[in-house]
Amino acid sequence: MLPMTFMRSNRTGMFLISALFAAGNLCAQQVDFEMMTWQEVKQAMAAGKTTALIYNGGTEQRGPQNVNGGHTLMGHATVIAIARKLGTAIAAPVMPFSVNNANAALPGTIGLTGPLFASLNEQVAEQMIKNGFKNVVLMGDHGGGQKELGEVAKKLDAKYAAQGIRVVFCDEVYEKANADFDKYLAAHGYPLSSHAGIPDTSEMLYLGSDKGWVRKELVATALGDPMRKAGEARDPNANRVNNGIQGDARRSTPELGKLIFEMKVDAAVKQIRQLLPAK
C-alpha cells in the first residue's frame, strides 16, 4: 500500500496538471481582445491568430420593444462567433457608435458624422497593426457607415501593402446576410420589416432573451409605419406611427433570430476567407 503522503502528493500534482491544462485550453479558445491579457494576445498571435476583427455596432433607438444598444450587443456576439469559426482571428472591442444622428422625438440614438466614424476606424485599425496583427477586417452591424468602412479599408490596404499587411472590408455580414434573410421571410409569408422589425427583434430575442435585450411583453404590439417598396412614395394622407419600427415585428421569434445570426456569421467567414486566403 502506498504511503498517505505519497498519495496526497500525487493527487496535488494531478490537480496542478489539470489546472494548467484547463488554463491553457481556455487561453487557446479566447478570442475576445478586451478579455485577454497582453501575454495571451501575444501567445495567440504566435499561434496563428494574426487577424484582427473590428466590428462596429451602434447606439440607436430600436422601437419600443428593443434596447438602444442592440447593434453593439448583437455585434459582440456576432464578431466572437466569426472569430471562433475562422480560428485565426481575435475580435477587437466592438465600436458602440455608428454614422447616425440623435432625434428628440425618439431619444435613443447617439451618432457620429461620417468623417469622424471613418477616422475612428482608421486609428483603431492602425493600432491593431501596431500591436502586431498582419490582417485587419472592418465590419459593421448598421447601414450607416458601410461606405466609410469600405473607404478606410481601401486606403489602409494600399498604405500597408508593402509590409505584407492586409486591411479589408467585409460587407456581406450586413448586405448579403440581410438580403438573404429578407428573401427567406418573403418566401415564408412573413410581413415586410426592416429597422426594429423581425430581423432585429428576432436576433435580439435569440441572443438576449434572458438578458433583458427585448421587452417581450411588447413584441405582440410591435407594429410600426408600413414598409414601402422600392420607388414607392409615402402616402401623404396616412397617419404616421413614428415609434421607431419600420414594418411589422409582431411575428419575431428566437428561432428566426438564430437563422439570421447564423447567416451573418457564415457570410462573414466565407467572405473573409476569400479576401484573406491562407498562405
Spans of model-derived segments:
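N-terminal start and proteolytic maturation junction detector
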Residues: R8, A19, N239-N242
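Bacterial N-terminal signal peptides
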Residues: G13-N25
